[in-house]
Amino acid sequence: MIITRKWLEKYLDLSNITNEQISVCLNSLGFEVEQEIDYSKLNTKLVIGHIEESDPIEGTKLKKTKTRIGENKYATILSTSRNIEEDKFAIVALPGAKLANGLELENREILGILSEGMFCGFNEIGLPNSVLTEDEQQDVYYIDSIYKNMDEMVGREISEVLNFDDYTFEVDLTLNRSDALAAKQLVKEIANYFDLKINNNEHKVKFEKPTESITIDLNKKVEDEVNTVSHTFIGLKNTNTPFDSSHDVWLKHSNVKSAQNKFENIANMATLISGQPFILIDADKVNGELTLTKQTIDEKELIVLKSGNSIVNILGLKTEDKFKVTEETVTMLVVMLNLDQISMRKQQRNLNVSTVDTQRYAKPLNPNLYDQGIDELVSILDEYKMLEDVQKVVTTVQKQNYDNVYSITLEKVQDILGIEITVEEIISLFRTLDIEISVKKSELTFTVDKNRTDLYGKNDLCEEIARLYGYDNIIEQPLEYVSFKKTKNLDKKLKDKLSDYLVGAGFNNIKTYSLTDIESNKTWNLFKVKDPVVLMSPLSIQRETFRNNLSKSMIDTIIFNANNGNKSVKFFEMADIFALNGFRQSNLCFGVSGEAITDSLSQVHIKSNYAYISSILMSVLDLYKVDVTNVTFEVNDKAIDEIHPYINATVKYKNKKIGFIYKLNPAFEQANKIYPTFICEVNLNLLLEIADKVHVTSEISKFQKSTRDISFELSNDVNFDTIVKAMLKDLNYLTNYKVIDKYSDEQMDKENISSLTVKLSFNSLDHQLTEKEINDDFEKILNNLKELKVKVR
């Protein structure tokens, strides 16, 4: 982004402020000044001349001119330029002049005729060819002005008309300050820094009620990518008014190549000032209906605006010749759009151009700049006296409406910044930035300028306060080391133990990217996390939002390894998932693909299976001291397509969702060329919450334990966990129990029952149990089962 001093002086009184001070100001505010150019030092003795006579010299390419260079003062100038014409105002270098290209002028005799100067093109006096048209690179430049009487300016220095002696600042904008692609935003910043009043010499133009109409349809291909669609109609007059040369120079100083069409140049000016790109169309050349769609051109898909089957505009470029606004145009249709930045960055790459429009379409600007934009466009047209009338802006699509009101306490600001700052000082920092501050006790409520799409939270406000306060004014404080009692971080200790266990079990710890695409995030939202964090300006569609699960990243890593020849893997990852409103959850995900256990020496090869992955989960629960008698596994009948419809379960603890355990769908495995894969993902925050944090060390009996086995029939509809407490109540010596077998035959299957065998362990701390004591407890179990109407085999 380039701003010039003379343009700033339209809005600010810079009479007591040097260029060096402006540069320091911009750098202090976080806008890095990459380059400064002082055009006033590039040339000397350049004046405005009027070509009154032009005669070709026979047999040569030369033309002999009589050029007025002052009141009753003339010079004979010979030139080979192809565009020498009478009654034109040109840039004349007089003898003794020094030009930016290194040339020093002196009188020169050619064919016996003394040439007393030279007509200049812009590339001879300091402008690069990159901002000049092909004609401008070869021809003499002719001066037009809508502000000055050119006859009266003959003999004066060119800068009195062209503003060529300007001083430019090329500013590098960070992505979060894309709002400064509207030059007016930098005016606010500089005014605020120097405590200057902004002079808004805006032309007061009355906006009429809409009398003309047009329909702008959105094709399904683009409707999700469009944020704003606005338009208006402008009546024109005096359309043959030439484009002012001072405006032309300002565009060139701003690194913008002027177009042959002056209306496109005026649109570029308004875009540089407001940030809003414009599509200008001759309203009489469209049939009352436009369509925004996508079309493949030269094998590249581009977003275009069409009238019927004809392309009116390829977004980022100027209007097609057939629909351009020209000097014959009576009514101009102005279309203003804002689209998804990722789509427009793709458009910019496909077009392989960087224009005033593409630079702004592809950045996260305020989507509702149309009012500011049309004010600037209308203001410039009014300066040219080309404005007949203008209708009120009609907005047909307006999707985005950012929340721009945030509150923070003074204490919070002081705590974050580490400075003693008062409410009055904070308010004084935002004098001209269109950020309103109201105060209630010690709470400050900020109503943020809607152009500042980078400010959307308390931390951003604190950073903004620090920026305006001045980073150099925040005194550096050495770190203060305070001794304190070492805290017991149970969560960290458990995670460390968990990591050690999984590594010991042969798992590799992986770290994957926290950002993912929106669609897969919706698909894999197993924990039903609400309000995902979507980036304002992501680098790509694959990195649009913070993930709400670890499973998708785990599966992608397994697929990547399989494609690179590593098909048998065991991975785990511990990471946090995020959402808006401060949501943060710590998850563990582990997965096995191919062989779960491999021992080449003993020829043991065990493929991944549900029993293995569930045993790892049970070990994790045991590490967290979770009471597994309250843990249940429920099949999810509505699993996503990527998950096996039957081999999957939601793991719950007293109806609280701990996590998920599942096998991938065989079709998905086959499509991605991976071996059978089993995944488990759990919520570590919940495990910590339900963990038994009070550990009681039990005395170990020195006496020999005794065991008994019992088998009984149980309906398949009854969960063993629901009867075990009643079955084992009122026992004196039971120390442990374990289900060791489950059996059913054909007849039992018909009756929907199974036989469970449970091993019971008995012992005592103070004596060796007698057979009678063991039998008494066992008899109680039999009676309990009888009460439960359970048949013992």
Curated annotation (Swiss-Prot):
Q: How is the cofactor bound?
A: Binds 2 magnesium ions per tetramer.
Mind listing the GO molecular function terms for this protein? ATP binding; magnesium ion binding; phenylalanine-tRNA ligase activity; tRNA binding
Residues involved in Mg(2+) binding:
D454, D460, E463, E464
Q: Which reaction does it catalyse?
A: tRNA(Phe) + L-phenylalanine + ATP = L-phenylalanyl-tRNA(Phe) + AMP + diphosphate + H(+)
Which biological process annotations from GO are given for this protein? Answer: phenylalanyl-tRNA aminoacylation
Q: Mind telling me which Pfam families this protein's record contains?
A: B3_4, B5, FDX-ACB, tRNA_synthFbeta
* Domain of life according to the entry: Bacteria
SMART domains from the xrefs?
B3_4, B5, FDX-ACB
Gene Ontology cellular component annotations, sorted alphabetically: phenylalanine-tRNA ligase complex
EC id: 6.1.1.20
Q: Which residues form the B5 domain?
A: 401-476
Q: Please provide the record's keywords in A-Z order.
A: Aminoacyl-tRNA synthetase, ATP-binding, Cytoplasm, Ligase, Magnesium, Metal-binding, Nucleotide-binding, Protein biosynthesis, RNA-binding, tRNA-binding
Compartmental location: Cytoplasm
Give every tRNA-binding domain span.
40-159
Name what cofactor the protein needs.
Answer: Mg(2+)
* Residue ranges annotated for the FDX-ACB domain, each copy included: 701-793
Q: Which InterPro entries match?
A: aa-tRNA-synth_II/BPL/LPL (IPR045864), B3/B4_tRNA-bd (IPR005146), DNA-bd_dom_put_sf (IPR009061), Fdx_antiC-bd (IPR005121), Fdx_antiC-bd_sf (IPR036690), NA-bd_OB-fold (IPR012340), Phe-tRNA-ligase_IIc_bsu (IPR045060), Phe-tRNA-ligase_IIc_bsu_bact (IPR004532)
| Oligomer status and interactors | Tetramer of two alpha and two beta subunits.
Q: In which family does this protein belong, per the annotation?
A: Belongs to the phenylalanyl-tRNA synthetase beta subunit family. Type 1 subfamily.
| Designated name of the protein | Phenylalanine--tRNA ligase beta subunit
Name of the encoding gene: pheT
